[in-house]
Amino acid sequence: MNPKSIINLFSILVLLFSFSFIFPIVISIIFDDGALPIFLKTLISISLLGLIGLFCTRNIKNDLSQKDGFVIIVMFWIVLSLTGSVPFYLSGMSLIDSVFESMSGITTTGATVISSLDGLPESLLFYRQLLQWMGGMGLIVLAIAVMPLLGIGGGQIYKTEVPGAMGEQRLTPRIKETAQALWLIYFGLTAICGVLYYLNGMSTFDAISHAMSTVAIGGFSTHDASIGFFNSISIELICICFMLLSAFSFALHYFAIYKKKPLKYAFDPEFRFFISFLLATLLIAVLIGFFVESDKSPSLREIIFHTVSMVTTTGFSISDSSDWPFSMSFLLLIGAFVGACSGSVGGGVKSWRIMIMLNHAYKNIMKIIHPNSVISLKIGTKSVGDDVATSVWGFFSIYVISFVILLLAILVSGLDLESAFSAVGACLNNLGPGLGLVSDNYANINAFSKGVLAFAMLLGRLEIFTLLVILTPMFWAK
């Protein structure tokens, strides 16, 4: 462990992060929204923090180990959430609300404690969207592209930050080139989405803001009514398309764009599984909507949009779903537990893990029926080793245990079971909106619950193992 090297790297990254405040400063000047002092103070304070750290470690040679990689990833998201909370705190929010909002933004969860978005300054609204966009692909992956220029290796950090199978493969020979390719795709999707939003009726401000949170699968909006504010089928269709694109593995986008292999989508088993699961969830939701009586029966348009939004773990809405059949709302919440594809910007357990667990369970059942048979575990045409299956089951076990512990913590704080279950599920899976008391926002829950849920967001963003590893005594043993 090299603490001074870690501090030096943090200082560089915090200094880079401080430059992001230039954008809300420009927005504040354009709209004259009165929030300019907030972002000027934030820019100065965060920049000074980074510069002081750099000065104190100016002669340090960066030599990062595997252990350092884990610490950097975990601590950076914590430091980033704390520094990112400054504008919210200076705007009058409490400390816990500020950290909650910042953590929700940077982890692309989309849960909010703000109950009146339409009354906020434009610069603060834009800042929320910007947090999600930067967190979408992972600020660490962005930093990897510049780390080689600073003499810092990024390979271990890349494997720690990028979830699922994608972290084990290099799309290009060099980590830096991989990060740059992913960010070019990410930026390209954002630009196209923003242009399409604008051409279909959004203002320039709303188009840019919603393009960032759509492609980031974040779910933050500049309006209380979310995407429903625009009441436009074309905007909803665009939103659906880009939520899906961001829920697919970015490795597939890379092969389609850079290698001219669009058929990779059709032949990818995880892609097919995700689409099949989405369609099955949609079919069940439609059947519930048409055959289960409730105070309000949702339209087919509402069901389709909300199903895609929930399964991709985005969290956008086009109408109030609190009066929908509870079975439908619960179904869509469970859909978020499965989540998006590995190598995407979405949350949840991830489709490839679900595939491996289902196939492994099927293999064991077949072994019981045919004890002398030799049955290999396959995903598509590729064999999967038992060590991989064991790792996936280990992840799922820790996931369930973490969920139960977080749920008990929230229940102890006094929240009802429906609200507590959905809040933990929504935050652990980086979804955002829940059911019951947290269906609209998280403003009315107590400070302890907000702290627990902020931790759940971080746990989900780091795919559990990365965070829990550094909490074990063995990790810190020499």
Feature map (PLM): residue ranges:
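Membrane-proximal intracellular helices of multi-pass ion channels
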Residues: 1-478
